[in-house]
């Protein structure tokens, strides 16, 4: 897929860059694999705001039931079409298996309509095939990687992303993330070969506020223009944040505060994102 640029006929088209989706399926999604999706507008079941300034409005969407488990084992399937999914940044593919069942999978780059894909152990190392980490050679790009066997893919699911197998350590595979972190994952976990589609997603320029509203993104109000009752930065005469470091509405530091608190999985991190070796063994 290529990028689309626009002539500056209006202020909103000046500088706008979008992804050209001319090669994707133009019809409706597969009816048996979609369900309604209600917008919660950033509220929970009690009506309390859980996502400030970021949710509300936007175009109505149907949720595509993407199979992250790749549970159809040892049966070849054919890619029938590649589709746009409004709920995620990468594209999805509709796969029909020999018994007539259909599944939506994440679509990797270089996959084409008519290609064959398979799930299971000891399959061919080919883009779109899914297999345990123990069957994948070192250095291969993979996506949709499980963290626990049978739990479904959790890592590398957004547009243009992938991770790499950098080595083996007993019953674990060493996975190098795009952030530079190296992590141990059980070799029985499933992963799919290839780099995910739509790598140009990172190059788009929205161009106008209206397109952000179509995506469900509302304007963000700065804390410095609020009253003291609404935000720690509020109040004062003129534009001042009160002389304190930037914080969230609840007072948590907004600049570089470490928030990770899952010590039980520290033992699986071989190298942190900042390239220092983990001292906790």
Swiss-Prot record:
Keywords annotated in UniProt? Ribonucleoprotein, Ribosomal protein, RNA-binding, rRNA-binding
Where do Basic and acidic residues bias regions lie? 258-269
GO: which molecular function terms? rRNA binding; structural constituent of ribosome; transferase activity
Q: Biological process GO terms, please?
A: cytoplasmic translation
- Signal peptide positions (record): none
Q: Name one Pfam family in it.
A: Ribosomal_L2_C
The reply to whether rRNA-binding figures as a keyword in the UniProt entry is: yes
Which SUPFAM superfamilies has this protein been placed in? Nucleic acid-binding proteins, Translation proteins SH3-like domain
UniProt xrefs under SMART domains: Ribosomal_L2 (SM01383), Ribosomal_L2_C (SM01382)
**Compositionally biased intervals (Basic residues):** 270-281
Q: What is this protein called?
A: Large ribosomal subunit protein uL2
Protein species of origin? Pelagibacter ubique (strain HTCC1062)
């Amino acid at each position: 897929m290529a990028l689309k640029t626009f002539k500056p006929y209006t202020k909103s088209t000046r500088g706008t860059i979008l992804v050209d989706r001319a090669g994707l399926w133009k019809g409706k999604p597969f009816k048996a694999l979609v369900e309604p999706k209600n917008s919660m507008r950033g509220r929970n079941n009690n009506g309390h705001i859980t996502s400030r300034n970021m949710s509300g409005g936007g175009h109505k969407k149907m949720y595509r039931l993407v199979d992250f488990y790749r549970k159809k084992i040892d049966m070849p399937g054919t890619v029938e079409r590649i589709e746009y999914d409004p709920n995620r940044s990468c594209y999805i593919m509709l796969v029909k298996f020999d018994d007539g069942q259909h599944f939506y999978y994440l679509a990797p780059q270089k996959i084409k309509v008519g290609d064959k894909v398979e799930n299971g152990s000891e399959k061919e190392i080919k883009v779109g095939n899914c297999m345990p980490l123990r069957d994948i050679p070192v250095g291969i790009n993979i996506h949709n990687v499980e963290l626990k066997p049978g739990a479904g893919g959790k890592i590398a699911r957004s547009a243009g992303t992938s991770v790499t197998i950098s080595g083996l350590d007993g019953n674990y595979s060493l996975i190098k993330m795009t952030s530079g972190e190296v992590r141990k994952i059980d070799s029985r976990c499933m992963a799919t070969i290839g780099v995910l589609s739509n790598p140009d997603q990172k190059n788009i320029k929205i161009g106008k506020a209206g397109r952000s509203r179509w995506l469900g993104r509302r304007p963000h109000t700065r804390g410095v223009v609020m009253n003291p009752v609404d935000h720690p930065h509020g109040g004062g005469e003129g534009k001042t944040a009160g002389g304190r470091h930037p914080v969230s509405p609840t007072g948590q530091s907004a600049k570089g505060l470490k928030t990770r608190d899952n010590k039980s999985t520290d033992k699986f991190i071989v190298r942190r994102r900042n390239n220092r070796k983990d001292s906790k063994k």
